[in-house]
Amino acid sequence: MSTGINAINEAVKEASAFTRPLFNELGKVIIGQSYLTERLVIGLLANGHVLLEGVPGLAKTLSVKSLANCIRVKFSRLQFTPDMLPADVIGTQIYNPQSGGFSTRKGPIFANLILADEINRAPAKVQSALLEAMQEKQVTIGDQTFKLEEPFLVLATQNPIEQEGTYPLPEAQVDRFMLKLKIGYPARGEERQILDLMARTSGTPTTSAVVDPKDILKAREVINDIYIDDKVKEYIVDLVCATREPEQYKIQVKDFIQLGASPRATINLALAAKAYAFLKGRGYVTPQDVKSIGMDVLRHRVAITYEAEAEDKTSEIIIQKIFDELPVP
């Protein structure tokens, strides 16, 4: 087994060489959001979409656009509004009166990295069109089906403050996002660095292309081979099952949980932990990798009860209690 682990470690070391210049390049224009940029890259490597919650002005758009520039892929931004139609996302067929036929006009979903801004402002049929494209990695326009080009990552944002005129995502649709991130303000020192950076540059700072898309696809193949010990697999399954039946693990949170995490959470937690280990240069997953990425995988998959809300308990507080009390292998 040690020989196999050594081979995987070597493969990870070789395949992850691009991550250092990638993060260095992102660090030139994005200050104080290392958590955001690392999780974006994890989503990209694990082939999972990301739901982002944070107030405006926290470099969400800049991060995604800069990442797209760094890896030579196409970036697209969708600003969702209540009057949008599915055709505004996936495209439509246009009638040509001269030829008497229809031509296909592809929508902004045909890109590699997509920022879906304020997804909860779009009506359900538009959300459904986007989420179907995310799940199937293909789009149907008229009677034609088009495959979406890899790598393909959707970063959808929600504003936690403004809830008027919004259409909250149903649990079944939120579950399709591998990660949900909560982004906070930068530290005071980091904010001063941002001010200095803007003083030195005219306009918005930009990044250079340092990674080829083939590097991302190769990294995904290596990540699939990263080793997870049976004990760590059991730990992952226990974590997810503890959100459904906490009393089985002697964790006193059952009255606060309305709906636990689905089996998709188990799969995504394993994939995200592998991608996290890859970024750390390892060919195997540790329980700490699972704990480090676990909150981002689980926070949007655990629905809380009215009793929990009355006691100001969030899904994060409940999940953290499970992490704290569940034995680590």
Language-model features: locations:
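AAA+/SF3 P-loop NTPase mechanochemical coupling elements
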Residues: S103-N112, I141-Q158, L169-M178
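Pre-Walker A (pre-P-loop) alpha-helix and adjacent loop at the N terminus of AAA/AAA+ ATPase modules
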Residues: V12-L58
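Walker A/P-loop
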Residues: L44-T81
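C-terminal engagement/docking regions of AAA+ P-loop ATPases
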Residues: M1-I8, K13, E245-P329
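Conserved C-terminal "switch" segment of AAA+ ATPases
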Residues: I8-S16, V29, T166, K180-V253, ...
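Conserved alpha-helical scaffold flanking the Walker A/P-loop in AAA+ ATPase domains
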Residues: R39-I42, Y95-L115
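P-loop (Walker A) phosphate-binding loop of NTP-binding proteins
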Residues: V55, V89, T157
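Conserved AAA+/SF3 P-loop NTPase catalytic/coupling segment centered on the Walker-B
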Residues: P108-Q135, E149, E164-Q173, Y185-Q193
